[in-house]
């Protein structure tokens, strides 16, 4: 099953995607809420590249930028496996040969370090899965990237019966104090408190009419059409209350109203990256159209062909929310078109840990989840299946296939199913 951050064939194809639980993941620098990565991250990356350069004998930083990191763990001398030896339990088992490096990828959200880095590995080896899953224990600090990599390298050395490399200890050296400001430290606490505070404000707003000045501030940046939608939702809620037909919960309704307002203000939304429609005016049932994907991807080309054939050049997702949102994730599935790859399961469910109870955080924003799914489809090499039977995508089948995958994960750890399984 896929972790929050996707990687493509050059990253995992049929291989494993295993990540660390974090908040609001915005792949490729997508919106994640909160301040963007600051000077600390730049200093961390610079330190990493200076220690684990491309000529390092054990661990190498292949590429690094503010939102993504690729690195390699070299297996020379691992487990005594000689050339041509059959892969053992501690050697890459899929898509590689003994001695190939372990390729590891990291995505960094805009909210780092309040949001931990999210890791993935190009392998379906459960031993590597365990290495990444243990990173969930490291959640706090301004140098999470360094802390995570120290744990990864140390655990990989143990896994492959290699001596601990002395350069790993260099990751403990402090960064210059002037680069990591108190503002960055305090922003982490502010981010963690934000959902509760904003929910309280939203709850008040639903009960009482805001003063004109306060309402103007709340509506700032939202277009007239979308303001009309918000007003209609409030009107329907009041009417349902009067009729004794209230659905959902105050907690979920308040948070979903906040999420919708934030989306309407978002530059990604206004820029046409995606669109949101409420199904039957229900705040708990969203249709999301992914209107733009990476133009260099095969998926983008497929969508252009789809437009010529069927007049639709978008991917339609459905988000279904329960009464206990935001403490449980939405159920997300692909409605159309039928896709292969991209970690899309039978029925259209999406195989990502962040969409499970274990990987979900109430601090996630819905926009960042949308952007993350878009990135996952592209990096997972999703392709449109032209001529496929559209009836194979349904809510019931998606729920069944996803439930089955979650049960397997709980017993055996995270893994990516074979391509033929979606």
From Swiss-Prot:
Under the heading PROSITE patterns, the entry gives: UBC_2
GO molecular function: any one?
Answer: ubiquitin conjugating enzyme activity
Listed Pfam families: UQ_con
In what pathway does it function? Protein modification; protein ubiquitination
> Which stretches does UniProt call biased (Low complexity)?
1-24
Q: What is the effect of changing residue 351 to A?
A: Loss of ubiquitin binding. Normal dimer formation
Instruction: Give start-end positions of Basic and acidic residues composition bias.
Output: 212-221
Name the Enzyme Commission number(s) assigned to this protein. 2.3.2.23
A GO CC term assigned to this protein in UniProt: nucleus
- Acidic residues: bias regions: 185-200
Q: Where is the composition biased (Gly residues)?
A: 25-35
Q: Which residues carry this modification: N-acetylmethionine?
A: 1
Q: How does it assemble?
A: Monomer and homodimer. Only the homodimer is linked to ubiquitin through thiolester activation. Interacts (via N-terminus) with B4GALT1 (via N-terminal cytoplasmic domain); the interaction is direct.
User: What biological function has been recorded for the protein in this entry?
Assistant: Catalyzes the covalent attachment of ubiquitin to other proteins. Involved in female fertility and embryo implantation. May be involved in hormonal homeostasis in females. Involved in regulation of B4GALT1 cell surface expression, B4GALT1-mediated cell adhesion to laminin and embryoid body formation.
Name by which UniProt lists this protein = Ubiquitin-conjugating enzyme E2 Q1
Q: Which organism is it from?
A: Mus musculus
